[in-house]
Regions:
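Feature captures hydrophobic
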Residues: 1-146
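Conserved HGGG/HGGXW glycine-rich cap/lid loop of the alpha/beta-hydrolase fold
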Residues: 161-223
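Active-site loop/oxyanion-hole signature of alpha/beta-hydrolase fold enzymes
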Residues: 162, 208-255, 420
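Flexible "cap/lid" loop of the alpha/beta hydrolase fold
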Residues: 265, 269-270, 274-308
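Conserved alpha/beta-hydrolase catalytic His-Asp/Glu region
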Residues: 289-294, 308-367
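Short beta-strand/loop motif that positions the catalytic acidic residue
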Residues: 369, 375-377
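Conserved alpha/beta-hydrolase "acid-adjacent" motif
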Residues: 382-387
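Catalytic active-site module of serine/aspartate enzymes centered on a nucleophile-bearing elbow/loop
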Residues: 398-430
Length: 430
């Protein structure tokens, strides 16, 4: 473990930032400063047009503003952040903030500003001589020129809750059907590596679909633009069950992450004879919220606010829940999916995740003799770990596995690491 935050580390990080392409792209046009405080000491890194200038010691902290970002933490928290192998939540400035161990102020309203601050934190580690947490980008062998992927995409028309949906899905492989669900505000591209993994497709017919309003599944309805998008439990379950029936899937295995992980448990509760097993990645009986008027009002406020900010912000804010050891290309691709979401979609998905999904008190009604339940949760999604553990304890016959080196988006942030955990589970079904 290295020492705590010091002036020489900040000066070193500023020099690295001045030559860092990622930091420069994210700070273009930023006239202001990044201020760092450790206990009673504080320093200012001036930025002119996004380029760092000489570090200045401070005698008092300035008021936080969008152009003056202030990062404060106790010496012990900085020591954890600057350790060789930081444990959750200290692998990321914003992860530590979510856990109440650091403070980054003000609340940042654009993804580039958020990512620039995150990047400066990682450059502090490099200035301390620590090995980068993220492995260097290595070229993928990929496909030969002119060669197609295995996955093939199609559109299918489905009637769900009295509405005709034109739903997009991709599939590859043959065998036991494996139905894959994406996270909030993303789409089936998150599963692209699984669709090409012949360790899986040699035994499973892998199908990944886009929810309406996501990816290539357009909104349904005659005047959808005049309607509030809200993902309810009934609609989410209806789409999965109706798609399985339309494709004539014989008791598929369902796997989903985040909202898909929550949906997995709803399907195990209400559709036990449709699915032979569900694999809940980052799933639980409930999120941190419950079904309440206050919760619904919070979702509506967030939806309105989201229209005023960078649509990439939700993904940037969740970067701290990804594994710091995941390939940088996977982390960046995960955030790209979010950046391409329409305003209001993330908030509409959160309604299901944080409000409408609620199975507390119903775990005993899930019959794992009819539909097996497997919970797998990444260690860097630290808030979900105890929630997933509780679900496994309360659902008779369910199992829980903590996935080391993974976060909230296992299938897109680090497919190979996910396979270390998913392949043994899938082996039970094919």
């Amino acid at each position: 473990m290295t020492g705590t935050l010091r002036a020489d580390l900040i000066e070193g990080a500023a020099r690295l930032a001045a030559a860092d392409g990622e930091f420069g792209l994210m700070t273009a046009g930023w006239d202001g400063a990044i201020v760092l405080a450790c206990g009673r000491e504080s320093w200012r890194v001036p930025l002119k047009g996004g380029r760092p200038a000489a570090v200045e010691p401070l005698t008092a902290l300035p008021a936080p503003a969008q152009d003056t970002v202030v990062i404060t933490a106790a010496p012990a928290a900085w020591r954890e952040f600057l350790s060789a192998t930081p444990v959750p939540p200290y692998s990321d400035l914003f992860g530590a903030q979510r856990a109440g161990r650091m403070n980054v102020a003000p609340v940042l309203t654009t993804a580039p500003r958020h990512q620039a601050v995150r990047r400066f934190g990682w450059l502090l580690r490099e200035a301390a001589g620590l090995t980068p947490l993220t492995p260097p980008v290595s070229p993928s062998p990929g496909r030969a020129h002119g060669e197609h992927d295995d996955a093939v995409g199609r559109y299918i028309h489905l009637d769900v809750e009295g509405v005709r949906h034109r739903l997009y899905y991709e599939e590859a492989g043959a065998g036991v059907p494996l139905l894959c669900h994406h996270t909030a505000a993303a789409d089936a591209r998150q599963w692209r590596h699984l669709l090409e993994d012949r360790r899986v497709t040699s035994r499973f017919r892998v199908i990944a679909y886009d929810l309406p309003y996501h990816g290539r599944s357009l909104p349904a309805g005659e005047r959808w633009w005049a309607e509030e998008y809200v993902l309810t439990r009934g609609r989410a379950m209806g789409l999965a069950v109706t798609l399985a029936a339309a494709l004539d899937l014989d008791r598929p295995v369902f796997v989903g992450s985040s909202i898909g992980g929550m949906l997995a448990l709803d399907l195990a509760r209400y559709h036990q004879d449709t699915f032979r097993a569900v694999i809940a990645l980052q799933g639980g009986l409930r999120s941190s919220g419950g079904l309440s008027e206050e919760g619904m009002a919070r979702m509506r406020r967030f939806r309105v606010d989201e229209r005023l900010v960078d649509p990439a912000l939700p993904g940037a804010r969740q970067s701290g829940m990804m594994s710091p050891a995941a390939p940088e290309a996977g982390r960046q691709e995960t955030m790209l999916h979010y950046a391409q979401s329409a305003p209001g979609v993330y908030a509409g998905d959160l309604y299901f995740h944080s409000v409408d999904h609620y199975l507390r008190g119903e775990a005993h009604l899930i019959d794992t003799g009819r539909c097996q339940v497997r919970l797998l949760t990444g260690e860097f999604d630290y808030a979900m770990v105890p929630i997933s553990q509780t679900a496994a304890e309360e659902i008779p016959g369910a199992t829980f596995t903590l996935m080391k080196g993974l976060g909230h988006f296992p299938m897109s942030e680090d497919h190979e690491q996910l396979m270390n955990y998913l392949l043994p589970v899938l082996a039970d079904y094919a």
